[in-house]
Amino acid sequence: MDGMAPVAASGDFAADVAAFSNYWRHTTERLARLPARPNRDAATYDLAESLKQAAREARFVFLRRHARTLYDRLTDNRTKFVRIERLVYEAAALVPGLVPTQAQVAAEAELRQSEKDGVEIDQGILCNQFLADPECGLHLCHAMLLPREESSDALAKFQRDGSLDLGCARVERQGKAAVLLLSNRRFLNSEDNATQAATEIGADVCILDRQSEVAVLRGDVVPEGKYAGRRVYNAGINLTHLYYGKIPFLWFLIRDMGFVNKMFRGLARPDVAPDEVAGDSIEKLWISAVETFAIGGGCQILLASDFNIAGRDAYMTLPARKEGIIPAMANLRLQRFVGDRLARQAIMYERRIECDSEVGRMICDEVVAPEEIDATITR
């Protein structure tokens, strides 16, 4: 059994944990004896890839039989909510080898993307199987739609002071609006690991704030470089950090199941399902104010906003094929706005869409002179 993957799960959770974990431990030890990925010759590269692939296939075998049992053990039979970034590491403790530990992920985070063995792929397999189960998947979505633990204190501070500085995001009042400012100014307000928590907490505060009637998402003023003195809406994912391996896999799930989904569906309540038919949620109209450009994931956010205001000089792009990433649900949402063919051109062939154009106005509800953005928000 040490060198061979179990061909099937027995159905006994404890027995299968023991058998599969033993196999994954053995595989990890064999991989550790090989040179680091950049130093492998063709033979050792092929061996490493075959070991990883066999281990991943074994994870699917285990999870197809035990995903719900595992999820129920991690959530006390779905009586408690566990956010996805905790869930995967608690699963690593309960079923050794199924997914990487925090130490293993941290070790790979020190490498460039091209140098990694891809231990986080195993987190993807786990999340895939949890989300594929309707009951587990909906429960996990519910957990990610709840306000973050930090948001209660942040809301109190915002209501006391009228402003909130979260570092890479800020919340301000502008008339009847709570304005969430993306403030990763060094990187043109792109999104990365440093911005994620601040942005989601800021969104929670905007939605929960009873003194405001709408929430506005806007980019902060860039202090230097080509766009110095101008507001930039969102440059998408921080490609510099992506290249250097600083964007973890979980970042994508946390962003899209948290911040973006909260804009789209509102905040969940712990005692009521957040579905659109029989459930309930705390919602607020979201307005995006597009200045200069909305690139990649920034453009994707526009598709989840309720109303988009854009400057006449602004543009949108969604170069997902070039980046190797489909931002959130953009491949499904964009075609609802502009049709299938134009969506393909944007995603696959980097078509640039001017906000002040026939196609741009299919996404942007109101296009105004750049100096009129503030007045349009407060109108």
What are these regions (language model features)?
Residues D2-R37, L51-K52, R59, H66:
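N-terminal, non-catalytic alpha-helical interaction modules of very large eukaryotic scaffold proteins
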Residues S21-T44, A48-L51, G311-A314, C364-R379:
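C-terminal long alpha-helix characteristic of the crotonase
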Residues A43-Y89:
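N-terminal intrinsically disordered, low-complexity regulatory domains
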Residues K52, R56, R86-S114, V260-E323:
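Glycine-rich beta-to-alpha active-site loop
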Residues T79-S151:
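Eukaryotic intrinsically disordered, low-complexity, charge-rich
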Residues D122-V221, Y227:
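Conserved CoA-thioester-binding segment of acyl-CoA-metabolizing enzymes
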Residues L180-L182, A198-I282, W286-I287, G311-Y315:
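A structural preference for short, pocket-lining loop segments at secondary-structure junctions
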Residues P274-R379:
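Crotonase-fold acyl-CoA enzyme core
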